[in-house]
């Protein structure tokens, strides 16, 4: 990893580069571009290859730390158009998706959503995704860019199998733009541009609306920062217009992958390919809450036998937060006990701009993963003390209707 470009190491962190190439490793000849690529260049975005897409890691106007703070205090605009957006139709659409994920999708209210997990027969996580039930007769699903090809193929295979058994379902992937407006000023910025009262749209609900004169937009109150925010799905030909309209507000600044990563880590949110993958189960990943009560009783999701046994007996390891006394623990750093025995591994780590401390996520053995426990992290051959810490590291500010 030391052979990676310096901007990968210092700006985004090594964990971004483990699976997704940055800067000079893979460049524009092979990477795809979102509809906002020229917009990013116009606004002096520093572009890197992430998950096969040319994306801004930061902008000239604000460094990553300043962008991070701006998101916590005002509002930042992120391009997340590289993510896979899918619509699922048919009278059996909920039964179909429940045959693949651990969540209670049938139990969702109209225009509400949930984080869920696609699992395999071994209980491993194929992807994490947001599933929204809409009033327009379809499920709206957002999943990770890095898993796009895998998930498309998986959906295709599963649709064929489901239909062969008489099920009625249709999958449609769309190329809409996707913008995330995140931060406490989001409501002030967005409310004047839409009919829906945001005071009546709590966390993890969604609505189709006309936004700043642009029809057929879907607004979902969610995000990847721990702040109040929305993700807006926009017809591709209107995405630049929407971005420019939002950026006209002086409370809004553009933000890139660098700030997005430190924000999500402070919020205790996983990055697929680093913190979760096909070798980790929902229970090991501390995502047991994603498994619906009814789904546990029915035990009919992929890997249910293994996952439910782990819920009952406790897994041998679990994803936890670490606060580190000094130095930055990057992906792959080993966690040890006081005797020098390996007891875990770091999956993500960065300096926390909010806390002015070094934080990380790690999988740690059961005996050592209790909050308050002191462990050692091997950083450049030095044993650095760290404390197992409850996540999120920074309190979340999601909006709920009282």
Task: Write out the residue ranges for each language-model feature.
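Context-dependent free N-terminus signature
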Residues: 1-3
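Conserved, structured C-terminal
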Residues: 5, 16-17, 21-51, 55-59, ...
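Acidic, proline/glycine-enriched N-terminal capping motif
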Residues: 5-8, 13-119, 124
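Glycine-rich, Trp-frequent "lid" loop and neighboring beta-strands that shape
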Residues: 130-131
